[in-house]
């Protein structure tokens, strides 16, 4: 059994917790870690932007990753 991680950027803790709870309820993941206050710096529309985001890291089996990705995209 191979374990893998998915790194998900969310706007805030509430959103990350809702996603984690849903994925756990559906038994798609084994565990979730939430990291608040991540600073992201990126280029958008020709300018450098800076935002604070919350990171959700989920742990799952490799064969479940496509299901996890699909569920996250629906949220």
Predicted regions and their residues:
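Positively charged, small/polar-rich N-terminal and surface patches that mediate targeting and assembly
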Residues: 1-75
